[in-house]
Amino acid sequence: FLNDKPNRFNYKYTDPSLTGGDTKYSPAIKAGQFGFYAQDKWNATSNFNVTYGLRIDLPAVFNKPTANETFNQYAKSKNLDAQVGIVPSTKLMVSPRLGFNWYLTDDHKTLLRGGTGIFTGRVPFVWLSNAFNSNGVEMKSTTISKSVPGMNNYQQVLNNVVNASATSQKPDIAVVSKKFKYPQVFRSNLALEHTLPGDVKMTLEAIYSKTMNNVFFENLAINQVAKTYAVPGKENSAAPYYNSEKSDYYSIINLKNTNRGYSYALSALFEKTFNFGLDLAASYTFGHSKSVNDGTSSVAYSNWKYNYSRDTNGKGELGYSKFDIPHRVMVRVGWTSPKY
């Protein structure tokens, strides 16, 4: 890097012959998410009530990336089950929820509450946009390594790529599986609230989440071979070895699903409000979160390449999530002036 001689770099460019001469062309994904929610509450007694609801989400993509027939024929010949030019079909995402509040005493000093249900967040359409930006048609990208002749003359190398004369350069492709489902989780919680002597409010709570559908990225341009690497003396350290597929593509990142992953958290919260405006609160949370891929990047190739795993192309090895926070302590101090 300091000598201006990188090992490799990634180059993305527009093919003006397919964009009407527009060298700043950028494909746009047109998408939207429609949501509907209905909820009702049943007061069984003065101390017990149940809340139930149903949320329906309808994510939709209104256009498609330009089909790449050359790639599609290649994928078909290799039985890759991948195709440029498709997006997930529009499907209803049904998320039922159920919750309850149960006061264990008539003075309402002790409350047991909980709930369970399926949850869908805002759909991350940015992951789907890779199929538009890396379709190998209007927008092209390639990874250039030091093995390319004339690597030190960057401008010449780039000119060769754009002019399609550097036949050794392999484009990067991003596709979406025909069976891809938008992320959803199943989540349950149970909490006990109790007023201690001195009007100190205590809350003990447990939350558990299980992945139903999450993202998983695989590279179809590499093949696993009969080799493994392992750290001597370290159990479960064996990792498979992959070779690049002999093809015209540097990477083929396929977006699909995994149902592996979970998280849990146990917390204790203590709160005290004084009559002169002072509010105090302190809490401790213990928990763990495990996932296959957190999808922290907007770029498909980065989500695959930088995912820590012994077998990043495997069926889904669980590891600690990048959002895993095993211990968290929070203290809050607030004061409300009588003047206001």
Predicted regions and their residues:
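Transmembrane beta-barrel architecture of outer-membrane proteins
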Residues: 28-36, 56-62, 90-96, 116-120, ...
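Repeated loop/turn-to-beta-strand initiation elements of outer-membrane beta-barrel proteins
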Residues: 48-50, 108-110, 199-202, 277-280, ...
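Short beta-strand segments enriched in hydrophobic/aromatic residues
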Residues: 44, 56, 102-104, 118, ...
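Solvent-exposed loop/turn elements at secondary-structure boundaries
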Residues: 66-95, 99-254
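Extracellular loop and loop/strand-boundary signature of outer-membrane beta-barrel proteins
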Residues: 21-26, 39, 80-87, 175-178, ...
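Signature of Gram-negative outer-membrane beta-barrel scaffolds
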Residues: 1-107, 295-302, 307
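Residues on the lipid-exposed face of transmembrane beta-strands in outer-membrane beta-barrel proteins
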Residues: 36-42, 54, 98-102, 190-194, ...
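Gram-negative outer-membrane beta-barrel transporters
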Residues: 203-340
